């Protein structure tokens, strides 16, 4: 009799707990690419959800008896919402499993042999559409989970369960936001891949041993065509940027107001040197405009370009585990640990004759990007691609506004952030020595911040170390011998006011790249506005194994905000992708009487907060206090 009384409640509780455990297992298994384990856990979770539903709806004498208690009587009606939420979670898991199992393998996979060219791959547009529909199905199930849990009267539940309901609601909302991004991405992807007409993209290959605003000098390019999901590198029209910039010819095109560097530097008026602004959309549009102008000037045909994708050698490192080892035209064994060094340095020593070196590197790069659509380990490709995008080693500009809107939403655009209600820092280095010494460059940015009322008084020091060991080959030294000549550009909020700038150590140049862009007026360096930001610039000259440093002192008005009973200081930091990530050190002096300080990620010593680490991603730092 007692077993009969206990059976109903036990099946209900056991079903709910088992569903949660198994669906968590399924999530972890799918994330790691373990599809068999994910399938088993999903089936178990679905069965457990059915068990919970059956137990909830079946007669249960013990539950009837427990209804005498007011606490149980109040809580039990809420269990219907919980059981509904569990069933919707299982439904979402089943649909997610279908995506995970079918996207990369089997008859429904996204990438398959091209029936018109058995040696090539094709992205199946109809399967992209089907996966997009499945994502929408998953999202609807997740939204139903949120709806059911939000309908629960948490106060009717035991206190021990309330936090779990709140966490589950937040998890559902977070998942819904992620699925919204995926839904938007799959909505534009068929068009981006040529499902409704041919698309051509300009793959801008940047050399980060010679820095430009977006991450490196644009020395090589590929035109990549997509037609109905079929990718093809247009090799005969790709290669050295000097196929476009014949004789480094400088061209005249209408320049936007924010193209300050290009307007002031004659050699920047061409496709391969127009990326001085760190804002990828601006630099990408200039690159396309100069490419078109160069084609017109030479009478050569040039296709309508639908977007520009910027990449640097770090992309090879991030994607190599998924792609597999490409041929390099050498016995040198390429791995994620050495491929960047090979491309930027060791290949120069292995092939000192420029023509042979370019041929070998071109062979490597062609093979690499062709393998993107026939990867050896597809499940390892996605996380590598995500990391390359988040670290700005890959940046995207698409010509169509609706597609670019999605890229911006995902923060894949490499654009200068608006950062409203926030202090702002972006240190951008340009190589004006015509060399490859940024391969040895180490940069440390140190901010000291003192808050005065609603304003921030900031001192930012930029220190560059030239780690080159002389002597080095001519192809590394370039035009300036062993002397490293980095142009430093500090981007601050548009209403920031410069108090003064000072050389802390070393030598600065007054006429490099030009006097207008480098010469100081007293203790004020050149200043310009760019995309809502104020920028101060100077150029250093640094011998091997030495460093140089410059400090900018400025005031940022109105940057401390009041939110409820807290004062809030927020700092938006953007980073320039480099071979060796810059280090950021921040010291913030708390106002007198500050209490209840909330400063995630900071360490505290007395009234000073400190934050220091290598900067590989754009980020936001925030401090809250009372008083």
Residue ranges and their predicted role:
Residues 33, 40, 270-314, 318:
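A conserved hydrophobic secondary-structure block that centers on an alpha-helix together
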Residues 8-217, 221-223, 358, 378-417:
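Non-catalytic accessory/assembly modules
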Residues 1-5:
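Hydrophobic membrane-insertion alpha-helices, especially the h-region
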Residues 28, 47, 51, 289, ...:
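A generic structural signal for well-ordered alpha-helical segments enriched in polar/charged residues
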Residues 58, 62-91, 98-100, 298-367, ...:
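Flexible, acidic/glycine-enriched loop-and-adjacent beta/alpha segments
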Residues 220-222, 307, 487:
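Conserved beta-strand and immediately adjacent loop positions that scaffold enzyme active sites
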Residues 190-205, 210-216, 225, 231-285, ...:
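Lumenal/extracellular ectodomains and adaptor appendage modules
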